[in-house]
Design a protein with these regions (language model features):
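Conserved redox-active cysteine motifs that mediate thiol-disulfide chemistry
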Residues: 37-51
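Structural signal for short hydrophobic segments within the conserved structured cores
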Residues: 4, 66, 97-100
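A short beta-strand-turn-helix
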Residues: 6-33
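Structural microenvironment flanking redox-active thiols in thiol-disulfide oxidoreductases
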Residues: 70-78
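N-terminal targeting signals for export/organelle localization
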Residues: 1-12, 114, 118
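Short pre-active-site segment immediately N-terminal to redox-active cysteine/selenocysteine motifs
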Residues: 30-33, 37-41, 84
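Conserved helix-turn-beta segment immediately C-terminal to the redox Cys motif
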Residues: 30-32, 49-68
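Non-catalytic, surface beta->alpha helical segment in thiol-disulfide oxidoreductase systems
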Residues: 84, 89-118
C-alpha cells in the first residue's frame, strides 16, 4: 500500500506550510501529489478507496498518494474548500492544484494523474 494518511503536522511538512502563506500553497514535495479527502462513513468514499489504493501502487515512486479524513482534519478540508466527499486534489510540481469532486473510476483516475501530474 503506497498511500499515506496525513495529519495537519504531516501536511505542513510534506505538502505545504499553509500557515506561513495564506495566499497560495507553496508545494514542498519532491514528486507530484494527489490527496483523497474522505470520511469513514461515506459510501462513495468507501467505493473509491480500493481504486485509489490500486492506482497508488501503479504510480509508486512517480506520484505521492495521500488520504485526509475530513472529520479528523477539518482545517485541511477547509483549506481546499472541501464541501462534498470524496474530493480529490491533484498537486503538480509546477502550476496550480486541481480539484475533482466525487468518486471516479480507475480509468478516469489514471487519466487525470497522467494529464495533470505527469
Amino acid at each position: 500500500m503506497a498511500t499515506i494518511h496525513l495529519t495537519k503536522g504531516q501536511f505542513k511538512k510534506r505538502i505545504a506550510d499553509y500557515e506561513k502563506s495564506k495566499e497560495k500553497i507553496d508545494f514542498l514535495g519532491d514528486k507530484p501529489a494527489i490527496i483523497d479527502f474522505y470520511a469513514v462513513w461515506c459510501g462513495p468514499c468507501r467505493m473509491f478507496s480500493p481504486v485509489f489504493e490500486e492506482v497508488s501502487d501503479e504510480y509508486l515512486g512517480k506520484v505521492d498518494f495521500y488520504k485526509v479524513n475530513v472529520e479528523e482534519e477539518e482545517e485541511l478540508a477547509a483549506l481546499f474548500n472541501v464541501r462534498s466527499i470524496p474530493t480529490i486534489v491533484f498537486i503538480p510540481m509546477n502550476g496550480n492544484y486541481r480539484i475533482v469532486q466525487g468518486a471516479i473510476g480507475k480509468p478516469q483516475l489514471k487519466q487525470a494523474v497522467d494529464e495533470i501530474l505527469l
